[in-house]
Amino acid sequence: MAMIEVQHLQKNFVKTVKEPGLKGALRSFIHPEKQTFEAVKDLTFEVPKGQILGFIGANGAGKSTTIKMLTGILKPTSGFCRINGKIPQDNRQDYVKDIGVVFGQRTQLWWDLALQETYTVLKEIYDVPDSLFHKRMDFLNEVLDLKEFIKDPVRTLSLGQRMRADIAASLLHNPKVLFLDEPTIGLDVSVKDNIRRAITQINQEEETTILLTTHDLSDIEQLCDRIFMIDKGQEIFDGTVSQLKETFGKMKTLSFELVSGQSHLVSHYEGLPDMTIDRQGNSLNIEFDSSRYQSADIIKQTLSDFEIRDLKMVDTDIEDIIRRFYRKEL
């Protein structure tokens, strides 16, 4: 059974169109013009138990609206979603015991309480038995290394410490599904690595299903089993990182270092379709569609055109592919 099941999910918002000027304002007040905006359009997908799904898209793509429906904050206009067999909008008090939510830019911790006291309050909110609470705290202390600051007030924690503390708070009641929204935002490289290792360990040891939204594409590449990408509320890709690269990573780059004194020479490939030439000093970069051109032919021809000191092949990485999606180049 899928841990997350989404079928034909739709969310519409109605907004009032205001006309400019005093007359327009009066007209809008007396006879307001309404427009329907489709934030999420007919989304359908499933996430099996234990999978880490990267749920990504540009700003305004509909990610936050979808997450709010999955967590029960918003009610769908049509369609439905089930988390662990439960409809999020039905009996929310029972449903929230199955999920954990972390928002990178907002904390669920009490600012003036010591972190340990915060966890004690959450224990009562989620009705966690004493025996399970102590077991969970031991596990979370080990995975997230909370011991050094667990007695400190939350307001004194660094951003990295607070993020670890927030993740622990969301996992205290042992949820089956964890929603992570930008969990590494604003963190330095070493802290990001620690957070990623902790997420991976939690996923592997507890089979926690994780839905991750992030603009840090290193999070996607290092954590996710699968990518679900949306744009304007609609699905545009669903598959693994390797499938994304195979499908859209056809553009490759050959980088040549030329022997000096050849600025007057021109590449044989100047002006050809599906090929971009970038020439700066003694550096020559040829970006090409690998489904149309063979790298061996390009190397052979370029060796004929120029005297080459060095060359290397650069594959298109996931960051470049997704950036092209956002720019509508793919």
Label the predicted regions.
Residues 112, 153-157:
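Conserved ABC ATPase signature
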Residues 174:
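Conserved catalytic motifs of ABC-family nucleotide-binding domains
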Residues 79-90, 95-96:
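Conserved ABC transporter NBD signature motif
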Residues 21-29, 120, 124, 131-149:
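Conserved ABC ATPase "signature" region
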